[in-house]
Amino acid sequence: MIDYKNTLNLPETGFPMRGDLAKREPDMLKNWYDKNLYQKVRESSKGKKSFILHDGPPYANGNIHIGHAVNKILKDIIMKSKTALGFDTPYVPGWDCHGLPIELKVEGIVGKPNEKISAAEFRQACRDYAKEQVEGQKADFIRMGILGDWDNPYLTMNFDTEAHIIRTLGKVIANGHLYKGSKPVHWCLDCGSSLAEAEVEYEDKVSPSIYVRFKAIDSAAVEAKFNAVGKGSGQISAVIWTTTPWTLPSNKAISINPEFDYQLVQFGDERVVLVKDLVESVQKAVGVESVEVLGEVKGDALELMQFQHPFYDYSVPLILGDHVTTDGGTGLVHTAPDHGQDDFVVSKKYNIEMAGLVANDGKFISSTPFFAGLGVFESNEKVLEKLKEVGALLKLERIKHSYPHCWRHKTPIIFRATPQWFIGMETQGLREQALGEIKSVRWIPSWGEARIDTMVANRPDWCISRQRTWGVPMTMFVHNETEELHPRTLEILESVAKRVEEKGIQAWWDLDPVEVLGEEDAKNYRKVPDTLDVWFDSGSTYASVVEARPEFNGNSTDMYLEGSDQHRGWFMSSLMLSTATNGKAPYKQVLTHGFVVDEKGRKMSKSLGNVIVPSEVWNKNGADILRLWVASTDYTGEIAVSHNILNSAGESYRRIRNTARFLLANLNGFDPKRDLVKPEEMIALDRWAVSCALEAQNDIKEAYDNYQFHTVVQRLMRFCSIEMGSFYLDIIKDRQYTTKADSLARRSCQTALWHIAEALVRWMAPILSFTADEIWSYLPQVEGRSEFVFTEEFYEGLFGLTEADKLDDAYWQQILKVRAESNRVLEQARKDKVIGSGLEAKVTLYANNEIRAMLEQLGNELRFVLITSQAIIKPLSEADVAEGEMAGLAVKVERAEGEKCPRCWHFATDIGTHTEHSSVCGRCVENVAGEGEKRSFA
């Protein structure tokens, strides 16, 4: 008996069914590194239009977390997809290396500077620590398949970068944006330094909530203002509300809104001044039963009326400020210019000076009556005692409210006026210019524009000075008496920058002023001891990196991509500095992603046990699963992750991998140079499959171009699961396995599979980089083929249907519907035990005239499309079964006639009629011993 198995074209490939990614990926990475893949990509893109994504530097401290993974994977997907779209995409990763978190870590290792160790040694220890942290994070980023110039990253502590940061400061000064002043800034008592806006977090804190009386200096004058002479009884007070009693010693005024209506109100046995809209709420809060309005005036009528400070021997004026609202409180705002931005601004208009009572360590200075030497938060209770003692405390409660905290120490911070260096938002029209530049940028998602616009419109001047050891120094000299900058400041800055370029920032601290100032000036000028805000470091990388590095060819940055918290962080600082120095935004597009949460929408927290560690994912599942999860998510909102979600990504991965494996296995023995069939000679279904791939590719390219990666994944899954997996790949198995190996029927099919595989691997590469690289190595080799898929552009060999194709896409879409209806009835027949597999079935399709005419075009090949042994078409009028879910079609399933062919598994009535091949059907005889069956459609 003949063994017909050897006459079949069974699929065969070395491409494994299981990804085993955790094991295979490191070997691929080694190959990428050994062969300098990043450089190969760069060389392949020479001369093409550039696309520059400037990497926002993560902080060089600690292990990477899942948010880092999301950020870097999104960037990598963009860079790889832009390469495939025909761009030159240099990617230089970077790190933020100066600043407080590193100082704190190093202090824990070597002690504080100038105590156990010199400042110079401390800086070197910080540099060494940061370098070590960079190496650890770098290894993790590389493990995720991120391509970039990892051997030459930018570090803000690189000597040349430090020098460029100093030069950016010079441009800020040259353009007139820098000034020195005493203004309230966020001040961390633990850091002993000012904080940037982006270094402030808001957490719940329990604070005293107090209503405080400021007695009228001249009650008769107040009565007169309210046209309430002789009305009511008892003392008159202006009532303020605050949650920071410690700021009352610094009170210098009470702010009111000129447009609001204020009332003099009988409050029990006393009279108080309140804004009209809040009288009822204050009455309720204080617990006063009887209230009577004695008079009412606009706020502007009360300007400069005097009230007594609660416990100090001076009076404070009522001053006008638009910052006063009726959202809460009393409509009269306690104003301490040392401790609030609005307080400072409004006091400045009235030439009210600051009190200067709080020192750098957060304690009241020795000359502060009642509270000398007390820490500000410690003094709260003492202030309350004093208020009670003098009868000024109207009401005390304790409330939990949102309060600013230091991002590093997690401790409450204060607003405190200190002499600092600022970039002025109004100086040289910087604010207006920046607001104009925001409009020229594409913000993705679009709400980002309104967000940063509001932030820029309302932000205070930028305090860029810090009182730290590990940071880029503000390499300036100021006059000992006038505090003015040296007249040759710009020249000096450049001279120092050159020294820093050679020896790093320590060159400044080692510098003898005589070397740059000469002996006479060195006597009259001193070094500024401050360092720059680290947001100045990273914010100036548009100059220190993009403008400075040769691979960017002087091109401007196309995109910044970071988490949504960077609107007030890196996006803001970069915009401010670039506008101040270059007169334009540093980016053309800004893309933001949300924060990672668990599947219930909760933040990652060790206490909740919901933390997903990236390394654990790639060690167990592989980095490609992590990458697929990131790409599958709509990153514009919160990004949910959990083990269940990652398992779901794993299921999607297996579907894509299985599709790729099917393609590769069925390309066994196919040589494109020898076996490729011309499009016009291909079988109709194969031509349609290639046209489906072209349509999918167009959708995928558009989605990549618009950074809609979840759409890419959805389209990829639809193509693999629906158009290919449940239709085309199912149908072609019979033709692929049973026809002659070199027949047109089979080579046409393999041609389609080859085109599809060449396209599919490129679609996958930006997301499933490791798997795409693996697939690429198993594809049939073509002369001149690149070694890596990452140097390739999207496949150009796909083609669409033409007018010459009688069976157009609309036709095949109808066939898909017919097949879906047939499958539904076949499945029911399986459940009813009428048949086992579809090949045991004979289907009769009762169709209306339109559907019948369509089906008849396939002739005898309809059964191959339906994957049944027999298919008969009859008029709908003859149906003895009901119409199904497709109007105009009724499907009847019966057991197929004849016997099962052991070679093709189809049932046939002619088995045994062929002398030499008596055990197989006539079709198989033709494919084994004859010229081979002819196919036209499927």
From Swiss-Prot:
GO molecular function: aminoacyl-tRNA deacylase activity; ATP binding; isoleucine-tRNA ligase activity; tRNA binding; zinc ion binding
Native source species: Actinobacillus pleuropneumoniae serotype 5b (strain L20)
GO biological process: isoleucyl-tRNA aminoacylation
InterPro entries per UniProt: aa-tRNA-synth_I_CS, aa-tRNA-synth_Ia, Anticodon_Ile_BEm, Ile-tRNA-ligase, Ile-tRNA-ligase_type1, Ile-tRNA_ligase, M/V/L/I-tRNA-synth_anticd-bd, Rossmann-like_a/b/a_fold
A cellular-component GO term for this protein: cytosol
Record's subunit section: Monomer.
Residues engaged in binding ATP: 606
A Pfam family recorded for this sequence: zf-FPG_IleRS
Family: Belongs to the class-I aminoacyl-tRNA synthetase family. IleS type 1 subfamily.
Motif ('KMSKS' region) on chain: 603-607
Claim: Glycoprotein is one of the keywords in the record: no
Cofactor binding note from Swiss-Prot or TrEMBL: Binds 1 zinc ion per subunit.
NCBIfam families attached to this UniProt entry: ileS
Residue intervals passing through the bilayer: none
Keywords assigned by UniProt, alphabetized: Aminoacyl-tRNA synthetase, ATP-binding, Cytoplasm, Ligase, Metal-binding, Nucleotide-binding, Protein biosynthesis, Zinc
The organism's place on the tree of life at top rank: Bacteria
Stated name of the protein: Isoleucine--tRNA ligase
EC number annotated for this UniProt entry: 6.1.1.5
Keyword Lipid metabolism included in the entry's annotation: no
UniProt cofactor(s): Zn(2+)
